[in-house]
């Protein structure tokens, strides 16, 4: 709740790096941290990805996925179908010079990625 309030106030939130990118991204995302599910990387095949996302959509709490930068636009498009209203945070290059955070619905992230 503190991170969400800081983000709403326009403050920049930076994670403290540790041994786990998952925790660093989660703690600075502004999404609820009281319950989360880590799904790792999704399968490469379209049907398997759709099935996995359908299963994940039923889970409560925050979902954390890893994805290759080469497939991120595909993932955002798939999220727009499977979880169209779910808040999404895309965190990349954490703790590096070009760290980037995108926040919004899957459709909003898709628009941000097209810029």
Which residues does each predicted region cover?
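A contiguous loop/helix-start segment that scaffolds small-molecule binding in enzyme catalytic cores
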Residues: 62, 66-115
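Class I SAM-dependent methyltransferase SAM-binding "motif I" and its flanking Rossmann-like core
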Residues: 2-59
């Amino acid at each position: 709740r503190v991170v969400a309030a800081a983000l709403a106030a326009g403050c920049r939130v930076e994670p403290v790096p540790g041994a786990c990118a998952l925790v660093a991204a989660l703690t600075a995302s502004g999404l609820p941290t009281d319950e989360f599910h880590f799904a790792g990387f999704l399968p490469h095949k379209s049907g398997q990805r759709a099935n996995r996302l359908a299963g994940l959509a039923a889970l409560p709490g925050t979902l954390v996925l890893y994805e290759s930068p080469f497939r991120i636009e595909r993932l955002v498009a798939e999220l727009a179908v499977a979880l169209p209203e779910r808040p999404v945070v895309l965190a990349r290059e954490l703790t590096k010079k070009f760290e980037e955070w995108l926040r919004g619905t899957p459709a909003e992230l898709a628009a941000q990625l097209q810029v």
